[in-house]
A protein has these predicted regions:
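Sensory/regulatory domains in signal-transduction proteins
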Residues: 173-175, 186, 192
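S-adenosylmethionine
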Residues: 147-155, 161, 181, 189-191, ...
Length: 221
């Protein structure tokens, strides 16, 4: 597609202090653009926030950075409590295993969507102008590429995932089965599945050791 015919993504619009604002919606998972936005700070209670996100309203966080993280954690606890209560009333014997699996996956997807509605605004250089916010510019650049000429709105939860991936990449993740090879660590990029199931690597190592003939074919499942 030529540059002249390129379709730009629809921006997120919201009212703040009586003025209309808009910014690019950043979502690595491709989550839908929120229809409504509520601008909030540290004075917002968790109960009101829970009601808003359950209705599909995005909360644009303008308060303290760490308070924003605590808000997401509080919402997660409320969602899990409601899920557990619903599960306690269900009758598992009446639900087929396949349906239980799909219901679980659906609940997890819904949980991610709701928690993703606590959002923040990043400046054009990926700077986060919140109190006590760390400098995330390098982490964002590694995950999303070089900054553009405009800011963006991103889920706080996704942003924390970007930072976690950056720390993994920088510090590495120790894998015992790789002892003796380089530093015994892997340095995954953003978007790589969490490399915490080290037992899988150990199984591969043992399988290779048990074969007398060389292995020239492998399957990544």
């Amino acid at each position: 597609m030529s540059e002249t015919n390129k379709i730009e993504p629809e921006p997120l619009n919201w009212l703040e202090s009586g003025q209309l604002h808009h910014a690019r919606w950043q979502s690595a998972s491709g989550s839908a653009l929120p229809k409504t936005v509520f601008v909030a700070d540290d004075t917002l209670s968790a109960s009101v926030a829970y009601k808003l996100v359950c209705e599909g309203t995005a909360i644009l966080w303008r308060g303290d950075f760490h308070q924003g993280r605590q808000m997401v954690q509080s919402l997660a606890r409320r969602i899990d409590k409601a899920r557990d209560y619903k599960a306690s009333k269900a009758k598992p014997q009446d639900i087929a295993p396949k349906d239980m699996y799909y219901a679980y996956r659906q609940a997890q997807a819904q949980r991610a969507r709701v928690l993703g509605l606590v959002v923040v605004e990043l400046a054009a250089d990926y700077w986060l102008p919140l109190r006590r916010a760390p400098d995330m510019r390098v982490a964002c650049t590694q995950a999303w590429g070089e900054p553009t000429d405009a800011g963006c709105i991103v889920s706080l939860r996704e942003l924390m995932g970007v930072v976690a991936a950056y720390e993994w990449r920088k510090n590495g993740v120790t894998v015992p089965a790789l002892a003796g090879l380089s530093d015994g660590k892997i340095h995954p990029y953003y978007g790589v599945f969490a490399p915490i199931r080290n037992e899988y690597v150990e199984l591969v190592v043992k399988a290779c050791q048990q074969r007398s003939a060389p292995i020239d074919t492998a399957f990544d499942i």
